[in-house]
C-alpha cells in the first residue's frame, strides 16, 4: 500500500460517512453495513457507485454480494486500487 | 376508559358487526373474482384492462365502507379535498388502521399502490392484485420499483404509499422507512401528505376485528397540499442517500407534528 492508495482509502471513508450520514467512529472494521449502519438494498447500489468513484472501477458483483462489514468493503476497495 | 359491562357488550356487538362485514366483504370479493372480473376481462381491451380492474376493486371497497359506516362501526371525515389533484402524485399516508387503506382504495377509483408479495399471492384477491397493474413490491430490485412508479405516475396514476411499510404500532412512535423518500426522489414525484387519525384505535397492528372498541371509530383523513419531496430536506440538494435520510426524517416530523395537533383538537371536542 503506497501513500496514494492510503489517500484514496481515506477519501472513500469520507464519502461513506458523508453520503450515508455516518460518524467516522462508526466506520469500525467489524461494523456490519446492514445491521449496524442501517444501509438497505438501495443504499447498496449507492455504495457500489461510491466504490466506482473512488477506484475508477466497478466492483465484481459476486465480491460485492459477499461484503458484510466495513472491513470487507475496505478490503475490496484496496484490491481494486492495487490492481490499477 | 373504564371497562364497564356496558362497554364490554358494546365491544362485543361491534366485533360481531365487524365479523359480519368481513364475511360480507368476502362474499362480495368472491362474486367479484368469479363473476364480475371474468366478465370485465371479456369486454375490456388489453390497454384498458389494468385500470378497469382497479376500478372494479374500488367498487368492492366502496361497498365495504358503506357496510362499515352503515352499521355504525366507523365515521369517516375528509378534509382538504377542495383543491385536491393527485394525478401523477405519491399519496403519502400514515397507517393507523386497516380502515384507512380500505377507504383510500374506495375513494380514489383507480389508485395504484405498491402491492406486497403476500397480496400478489393471496388466495382470494390474487386475480385483482395481479391483473390490476399494481406496482410489484420488490426488495431484490429497488430500482425496478422506482422505475415502475415513475412509469405509473407518468401516465397519470395516483400512487398510494405508506412510509411506515406496515400499520403503526399503537403506543410506539411513528417510524418511517426510507423507501418512500427514495421513490419520490429518484422518480421525481410530487407528494400529497395524507394525515390520518383513528380514534379510538381499531383494526390497528395487534388489534384484530374481534377486538373492536366500545364506541364508534372516528377516522379523520386530512389531505395536505401537494409539494416536492425536497421540501422536507434540511439542506440544499446533496447526494441521494443523504437526501433520502434527511427527507425521511423531515416527513416523519411533519406527520408527528400534524398528528399531535389533530389529537389536541379531538381532546378539545370531546
Question: Where do the language-model regions lie?
Answer:
Chain A
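Catalytic nucleophile serine of serine hydrolases
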Residues: 41
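Thiotemplate assembly-line natural product biosynthesis machinery
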Residues: 1-25, 78-84
Amino acid at each position: 500500500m503506497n501513500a496514494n492508495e492510503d489517500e484514496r482509502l481515506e477519501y472513500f471513508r469520507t464519502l461513506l460517512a458523508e453520503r450515508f450520514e455516518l460518524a467516522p467512529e462508526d466506520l469500525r472494521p467489524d461494523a456490519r453495513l446492514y445491521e449496524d449502519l442501517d444501509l438497505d438494498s438501495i443504499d447498496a447500489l449507492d455504495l457500489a457507485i461510491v466504490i466506482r468513484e473512488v477506484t475508477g472501477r466497478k466492483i465484481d458483483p459476486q465480491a460485492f454480494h459477499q461484503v458484510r462489514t466495513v472491513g470487507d468493503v475496505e478490503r475490496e476497495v484496496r484490491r481494486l486500487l492495487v490492481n490499477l | 376508559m373504564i371497562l364497564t359491562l356496558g362497554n364490554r357488550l358494546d365491544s362485543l356487538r361491534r366485533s360481531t358487526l365487524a365479523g359480519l362485514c368481513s364475511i360480507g366483504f368476502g362474499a362480495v370479493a368472491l362474486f367479484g373474482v368469479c363473476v364480475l372480473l371474468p366478465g370485465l376481462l371479456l369486454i375490456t381491451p388489453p390497454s384498458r384492462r389494468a385500470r378497469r380492474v382497479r376500478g372494479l376493486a374500488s367498487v368492492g371497497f366502496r361497498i365495504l365502507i358503506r357496510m362499515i359506516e352503515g352499521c355504525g362501526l366507523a365515521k369517516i371525515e375528509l378534509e382538504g379535498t377542495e383543491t385536491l389533484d393527485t394525478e401523477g402524485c405519491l399519496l403519502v399516508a400514515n397507517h393507523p388502521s386497516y380502515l384507512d387503506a380500505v377507504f383510500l382504495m374506495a375513494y380514489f377509483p383507480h389508485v395504484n399502490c405498491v402491492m406486497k408479495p403476500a397480496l400478489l399471492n393471496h388466495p382470494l384477491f390474487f386475480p385483482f392484485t395481479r391483473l390490476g397493474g399494481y406496482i410489484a413490491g420488490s426488495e431484490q430490485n429497488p430500482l425496478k420499483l422506482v422505475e415502475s412508479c415513475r412509469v405509473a405516475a407518468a401516465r397519470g396514476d395516483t400512487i398510494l404509499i405508506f412510509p411506515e411499510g406496515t400499520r403503526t404500532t399503537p403506543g410506539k412512535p411513528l417510524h418511517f422507512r426510507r423507501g418512500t423518500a427514495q421513490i419520490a426522489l429518484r422518480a421525481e414525484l410530487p407528494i400529497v401528505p395524507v394525515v390520518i387519525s383513528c380514534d379510538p384505535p381499531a383494526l390497528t397492528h395487534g388489534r384484530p376485528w374481534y377486538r373492536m372498541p366500545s364506541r364508534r371509530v372516528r377516522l379523520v383523513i386530512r389531505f395536505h397540499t401537494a409539494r416536492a419531496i425536497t421540501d422536507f430536506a434540511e439542506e440544499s440538494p446533496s447526494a441521494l442517500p443523504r437526501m433520502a435520510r434527511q427527507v425521511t426524517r423531515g416527513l416523519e416530523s411533519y406527520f408527528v407534528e400534524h398528528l399531535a395537533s389533530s389529537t389536541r383538537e379531538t381532546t378539545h371536542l370531546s
